[in-house]
Each structure stands twice: as C-alpha cells, then as structure tokens.
C-alpha cells in the first residue's frame, strides 16, 4: 500500500511519531519562506494515481486536491475514497484545545488506512425516490405502524429560501435506521395530506433547523406538528461554537456516511459552468428529481441517526435535560 502525506511547505514536524505506517512526504510549495501559497507557488510533483491514500495536512493542500475549503470540517475524514484530511498540528501551539481533535483525526486516519473504518453508502433499496401515490401511501402507513421508534425524521427541498416566494419540491422522510425516501410533492393530494397529518399526530417529528422547514409545511399544507424536535438546537447543547451545526458538518463528524452530497455539489458546479449561471441565481428546482432523490433521502437518514445519538447523550446528562 502506497501512502503520501502532503503539507503546505517543508517543515520540521515529526509526523512519523503519529503514524505507525510508512509514507512518502511532499510539500505543496517547496519554498518554506512562503507565508501564503498562491496558485503560482504550487510546484508539487506527485502522481496521485500511484498512491492509495493521500493525507492532506492543513487547509492549502486540502483545498488544492479536494476543492473543499474547510479542513477543520473534514478533519480525520475521507473524501473521494482517497484523500484524508488532517488539521495542521502547528495550530496546537496557539490553540491547545485543538489537540484532542488532532489526536482523534490521527486515530480515524489510521482506521481508514488499516481498513477498520469504511465510508458507508446505502443501496437503492434503502435510499430512493417516490413519484407514485400508492407507494407514498404505503410508506406513510409503514411509518405509522412501525412500533420500534416513536419518531420520524422529516426534511424539505424548496425552490427558494422563503415560503411565500416559492414552492416545496419534495420532502424527505425516515422512520427507521438506514432507510429514507424523497417524495416528489406532485404526488401529494388530499389523501396523502391526511395520512401525513395522522403520522405527525402520532409520532414526534424530527427536523434539522425546524425554523426553516416548519414554515414550508405549515404555509403550503397547513400541517400541524404537536410534538417536534430539532437536531440543530440539540447540538447547540453540546457545542455552542458557530459554524459547527450544519447537517453536512454533523453527518461528517457523527456518522459513517461522510460527505454524501459531494456528487450533488459537483453536479451543481458543472451545471453553473455549462449554463453560465452565477451561484447566487441557482435554485434547487433546477435539479432533476433523479439527481436529487438519493441525496435528499440521505438528509432524512442522517437526521434520524443524529437524533438517536443526541437524545441518548442528553438523557445521560442531567445538566443538559430540560
């Protein structure tokens, strides 16, 4: 197995003491005097196809190889089945609290390379789209009569940020682990609405950022939610730091599904480029159902899993229960 470690510029950091495997060491820029690396400064010579794994240390190598901007968000995680993110250990000198995160990332990276950890992807029989009324009714009935869990996860995909400015494209739902669907809103009629409301009356409904989703379900369908939860607010109980509460961030940190929206993000970027559209002008109604369904369904799957984890943790801590 061939492994490479890439840092921003050559340094004296002893990475060998953190890993028990051999690796080749590279620098994105060979000039160690550079403080800020520009595109023209990158002179690394590496054939990434010759390596099974690339450990990317710090934000510059991470951004160069993955086109992602936040190495902290992906710290210790896998991207594109090849790249492993690691925060720069130099930051521990002025931010000692980062040591725990660094050590956990080292353990995670070692696990991926050894094969003990794997990024999971659900099959089409577990995560899929629905555009048929009978199938929606069957799914909702199964959700109502499932006695193993007293909650469901619910998410919405919309054409705009504000409910008065657009329409709901579809909703995602999960009523059991590792099983989620994305339903096209075109199949919602009076029968489906009645069945959905029955479900909402009988079980707790879990959102991630309920402030957003509630307005859409209430404004466009007049749904009522007698008992709902919010995994975003729950996470604030554990970590009040800003920028750490998004669903994607939490999925990467707390689940084995990782950055499951990566392919969707790539599709959007390609669409913008091919059609000459600015990102600010893009809306989700431009994404075909067949492209959207798998990723939207995963939102509900992840929300369901996060709620299980967070509620269990809260129940074990009397100081966090309300």
Q: What label would you give each PLM region?
A:
Residues 61, 213, 299:
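Acidic Asp/Glu-based divalent-cation binding sites
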Residues 66-75, 79-93, 102, 106, ...:
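Metal-dependent phosphoesterase core characteristic of DEDDh/y 3'-5' exonuclease domains
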Residues 118-126, 225, 265-322:
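Mixed-charge, glycine-rich, non-catalytic linkers/tails in nucleic-acid processing enzymes
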Residues 1-120:
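A polyanion-binding, active-site-adjacent surface
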Residues 5, 17-26, 120-253:
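Conserved RNase H-like, two-metal-ion catalytic cores of nucleic-acid enzymes
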Residues 54, 206, 299, 303:
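Conserved anionic group-binding/transfer micro-motifs
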